[in-house]
């Protein structure tokens, strides 16, 4: 059984006037992509995600509970209205199916290569003929989708970062694309710490794109009723820089 990370709020911390004070709030699933380490063992949800969800829970009084799943399954559950999908890009295809929150923060899309076989990216033409590993079921910004299958091809059958990096190490793909709020050097150091292998990983200096990290909710879901509450909380956290301060703290962390 998957471990659930409960993000709850004591009644004394509820916002003034909250209708949830003094009672147990209904659980709201926050669906995130699961990950495993280099040996295939499940990894806990990243501190950045748990921290952001915790801030939202504290700011709204909602009982937000993180549920890690393979990304394709997380999307299917969200489409069925069974939770909030964390981190899905607002592509035209998804906009027909989901409503989206205001941006939580920004994340860049970085290319990772073996240090022994780097590539340069300044324009999309630099990726002509390349095979790029993306997250299973991943969809991205307009430019990426325009070049997908034309300038370059994608491989999206590997579900975890560890399995994607394994494909990269044996030459099945030319690069792995990862989303992160970190800069290139910081992400590179983290990957080499978490996924040490025969060689080192290099992150290409220029990102493919930078997009907002959003929460998505199916248009047919009753969870649309909490979207205004979440957006108001996101506005308050933006003014207080609560999320930004949390991410900055993660950038200075000494552990992986």
Identify the role of each PLM range.
Residues 7-16:
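Bacterial N-terminal signal peptides
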Residues 21-97, 240, 249-250:
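Extracytoplasmic small-molecule ligand-binding "clamshell" domains
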Residues 32-35, 107-110, 193-231, 252-256:
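Periplasmic-binding protein-like
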Residues 33-37, 42-46, 90-91, 115-118, ...:
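Short coil/turn segments
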Residues 47-59, 125-131, 212-247:
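Extended ligand-binding regions for polar small-molecule ligands
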Residues 51-60, 102-103, 137-159, 165, ...:
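Ligand-binding cleft/hinge of the Venus flytrap
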Residues 59, 68, 72-83, 99, ...:
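Short helices/loops that flank or line small-molecule/ion binding pockets
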Residues 66-126, 137-140, 205-208:
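Acidic, polar ligand-binding/catalytic clefts
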